Amino acid sequence: MADDEFIGRERECAQLASPIAEALRGHGSLILVAGEAGVGKTTLARQALSRSGLTVLEGFATPGGASAFAPLVEVLRAHLRSARDGPLVEGPLADHLALLLPELGRSAPQGDPAALFEAIRLALATIAAQQPTAIFLDDLQWADDATLELLPALARTLSEQPLLILAAYRSDELPRAHPIRRMRSELRRSGHLKQVSVEPFDAEATAALVDRILGPVAPTLRRAVFDRTDGIPLYVTELSAALAASGRLQSGASGLDLLDGADVPLPESVRDAVLLRATGLSEDARAAAMAAAVAGQLFDPELVRAVAGLDTWPDELLRRGLVTEEPAGRMAFRHALVRDAFYSDIPWTTRIKLHRLVAQHLAAGRATPAVIAEHWVLGREPGRAREALLAAADGYCAVHAYRDGARAFRRALELWPEGEDEGSRLDVLQRLGSCAELAGDLGDAATVWREVADGRQRDGDDRGLGDAQRRLAAVLELQGRWQEALASRERAASAFTAANSPADAAAERLAAAAHLRSAGSFRAALSLLETAAQQALAAQRVDLQARILGHEGNARARMGEGQRGVELVRAGLAMALEHGLTGPAAEIYQRLADALEHAGDYSGASATYDEAYSFCSANGLEPTAQLCLACLTTVLRQSGDWDRAAKLCRQVIESPDASAHAHAVATGQLGFILGLRGQTRQARPLLLEAATIARRIELAAMELLSGWGLAIVDSVEGAPQSAAGHCWALLDRWKQTEERHFVISPLRWATTFFAESGDASGTRACAAALARIAADVGQDEPMSALSHALGETALIDGSVEQASDQFARALVLLQGYDAPFERAESQRRAAAVLAAAGRREEAVEHLVAAYRTSRRLGAKPLVNQLAAALSALGERPEVRLGKRTATQLENGGLTRREVEIVRMVATGRTNREIARELFLSPRTVEMHVSSILMKLNGRSRADAARRASELGLLTPRAD
């Protein structure tokens, strides 16, 4: 064996060698080191790093309470103790780092979590930039939640830094809800989960370790040690040392063995081995060991000496290897299991007394409240423990360690005497609710806010009840539990009304109405807005009055009262601008554009969305600006500017400021455009994502539009049954709303889809829905869609003449609208009717006009349908459309070179073989194949060959 320090760890050392080498080359990573207690994780990490060439810094977690980010703070302090270079972080971030390291000077206000994370990340990067560095974090099973939540985020930043982080934890101490499991899941999700598992020694390695400690040992003793310890290195070490100290070993022919006839029972556990080894400690040393065990794994020897009532520190513990010296004048037990052994041997009453003494000394010093609280808890002092836990919770929250803060608040509440100071208890519950929200524990937060609301109601505190119901509503909305959220909003409004706070009541009803508007429940929204308007007026809140006007006008426009709705929104906007209310004005600007869109003024809506975007951007209101852009894409798509719409969709999707609403709209519209263009492989995941978000936030318009998009995708991919399912689902969802605008085009398309599929019931159901919308709204756009639908039903009934009249009327009614895709679809269906009536020239004119429109839009599936319809009428495409266009249509959009290549792909040739035969570069062939896959909507070469066969491209045509 080259080095006895690495007994039995060849595999683990090999696993660590690669990330160490990569870190030296500037490519760091996070490596988890897992194994049961005493298996040697710490020894392995330290030995591997000691010869790595990396500067090593250590931090560790301890049981019994700690400050937020404690292991990382320990690392930073270790660096500061030895560093001679400049500051870790400069500029504003230095103040954020001072929240964790007060010795750096003035700290920032609480700030935001992102700034604190960036300060920590930059500090670690600064350390690594000075010298390639390894950070060893030990015993993370005891770490605070904040540290464990930060590590996955750090892992994503290490690949371009000379920084390796080894993080060790006990794998045998992880209950199902342990935060390490969340950390591992997040690392796995992001592709950064790397772990070295440390296993117990086998019999051979155990024997080698025993021989190293005791010298050559008889085989019988080796077997006895292995059988008793199961190869746990710490147990092997302690047991071997205990046997050596017992004086009951003798030398024999095969090595050391137990004395003949000696009754020396082997210890049953590490605890027993440690206590056996400690036999013979002086009274002072035993007192110091007990006090140190109570103080913690890492302790201040001066504090322990004072608690134990000793004049001097007994060096005996150091000599026996039970404790070790640590930086900053501290000491630590050699292993946590050694500390556990001493702690478990302390009588219960003595233990309580020692915890109280430790708490008193810590409270007189500068210890963190979390550590002090733990000693008061174990010292059976609930009042003092509660006070310290509340201070600890506040400290956690100050550095955004909200899970840790919530845990401290819960523990403080568990210690609250029943019936004592109920008002203060409810205040603490409120702080817990806020903490749970910020930690993302929404289920817990909802439970807490319900309890607060019940308590405030019992106390007759209407104001407090309103606040609690408001917070509960916000949490329920985040969970997507909208009906419960709306009920909480109403309860909050009622409580605020009872508390004579009309402004708050109006704000709650406005919030509820805003959601109902998005969900397509316009009448319910208007009912709430009516009451809210009265309360806003009573409170003299101009901002609320302006916003209520904007919402009311928008809701009325969505119900078909276009002119009145637009006038109300304009009045709200004028009010907001007159009083310099920038935020409300931005919101109402967006509502105005939406109202114009619903009133059928697409050019006005487009211009207003552009104006609203500029206004929001100029005033730093980026989330509203992104929403305006997202909504603008709907108008652009409707009016045929698909390229700009797609570009803006991508801009919104990439924006960190986009709300869920904006993201749903942009994702759905981009997927919809790609679907209309035949790029179904890219379209489907976008539409599914949009549908998921829209359902979660109850955005009815996008639920309907994404469902339509998925129907189009299925239709293009040749899955009519699935497409029909989406159409029926669209109808069902519409019936649950009062939506009268965004559903018009989907129903228009679904009517034709059902008709061409021979589904008369689906056709009639869509026509009936459009008839209801047209009656409610009375605008030309829904009337055009209804005429289109009636044309389809007339065809089903066999009345070609009536169908022709209806399609003609549909086209006339569209003349005032810039809706090219809908016009092209109606022209295609009108042409089919005209052809059936023998009016061939008129049919061809419609087809050519529709073809040119769809070609401009890039609507490839519709282009192909129109070209096929022309061919069916005996038209030569090269005459009507131009020779180049006709050839591309015949070839499924492929160029001659692409047709040549797809034929070779179908024979199984590789890109390199094709390149050789056609005297092209492999890269050029690769580009052609990618283009073929996109044009034929294929995922693989086999898909392309199959589609080419269906189009008849694999057999050369005779000229």
Where are these predicted regions, by residue range?
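Tandem amphipathic alpha-helical repeat scaffolds
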Residues: 38, 341, 374, 391-398, ...
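Short secondary-structure boundary elements
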Residues: 204-416, 774
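Extended alpha-helical scaffolding segments used for macromolecular assembly and cargo binding
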Residues: 28-30, 44-48, 132, 311-313, ...
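Short coil/turn linkers that connect adjacent helices within long alpha-helical scaffolds
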Residues: 365-367, 379, 399-400, 418-421, ...
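Helix-turn-helix DNA-binding segment
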Residues: 805, 871, 881-936, 943-959
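Conserved Walker-type P-loop NTP-binding/catalytic site
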Residues: 70-134, 185-192, 201-211, 215, ...
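Alpha-helical sensor/transducer elements of the RecA-like P-loop NTPase core
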Residues: 43, 99, 159-220, 224, ...
